[in-house]
């Protein structure tokens, strides 16, 4: 990091991504790059606690570059996904609900890299919570090599067919380059003053 690079005010980012590497080498390369960027920006990683695939790649990259990693994993996945025991903070919980709750509490923003059904479910859940006024934390979709293009088309179709109503648009930021993630989140945080959960809920209630 050069002397002119600004340190983000973000404390931690939750990253959703696959427990496999995917077929395109760009996925692992990008996960590694984002881990380096997080560490150099002094932003902690909150993630699913595994050591395999994109999950393991980003976590090890954060550690290799002197950053902090918080892994949160249910006990029944601790062997299947091979916990990353090198993480500074490794929390074993009872179930997926506790995992997602803690990941939410410990994070200032959310980023989704390529992944499978688990990644998609976690990402969409944050979009839903935001749409329902449960939080206003930035949610970023990293669209590596157009991986998420079909999902974006589906979201557009939902809007066109009236299932995502005007005023309840998805609170989602889409970026194509890993180096744009943190500036995009910082810009989003700076554009909106801090509001209470009650204020967010009151605004959303007028849309139904």
Q: Could you describe each region identified by the protein language model?
A:
Residues 63, 129-137, 163-165:
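Arginine/glycine-rich "motif VI" loop of SF2 helicases in the C-terminal RecA-like domain
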Residues 2-106, 146-179, 188-208:
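A cross-family phosphate/adenosyl-ligand binding-site feature
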Residues 116-118, 132, 145-147, 178-180:
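Short acidic/polar capping segments at secondary-structure boundaries
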Residues 98-133, 140, 191-199:
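Active-site/ligand-binding-proximal alpha/beta "capping" segment
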Residues 185:
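Hydrophobic "lid"/C-terminal helical patch
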Residues 136-145, 174:
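Short loop-to-beta-strand entry elements in the cores of soluble alpha/beta enzymes
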């Amino acid at each position: 990091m050069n002397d002119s690079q600004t340190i983000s005010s973000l404390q931690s980012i939750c990253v959703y991504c696959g427990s496999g590497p995917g077929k395109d080498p760009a996925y692992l390369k990008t996960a590694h790059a984002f881990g380096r960027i997080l560490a150099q920006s002094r932003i902690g990683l909150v993630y699913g606690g595994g050591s395999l695939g994109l999950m393991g790649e980003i976590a090890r990259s954060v550690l290799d570059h002197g950053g902090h990693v918080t892994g949160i994993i249910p006990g029944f996945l601790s062997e299947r996904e091979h916990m990353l025991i090198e993480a500074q903070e490794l929390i074993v919980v009872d179930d997926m609900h506790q995992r997602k709750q803690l990941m939410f509490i410990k994070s200032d923003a959310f980023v989704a890299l390529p992944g499978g059904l688990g990644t998609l479910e976690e990402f969409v859940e944050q979009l839903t919570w935001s749409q329902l006024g449960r939080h206003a934390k930035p949610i970023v979709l990293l669209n590596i090599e157009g991986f998420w293009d079909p999902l974006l088309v589906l979201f557009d179709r939902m809007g066109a067919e009236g299932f995502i109503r005007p005023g309840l648009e998805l609170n989602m930021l889409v970026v194509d380059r890993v180096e744009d993630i943190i500036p995009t989140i910082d810009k989003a945080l700076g554009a909106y003053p801090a509001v209470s959960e009650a204020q967010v809920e009151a605004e959303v209630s007028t849309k139904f």
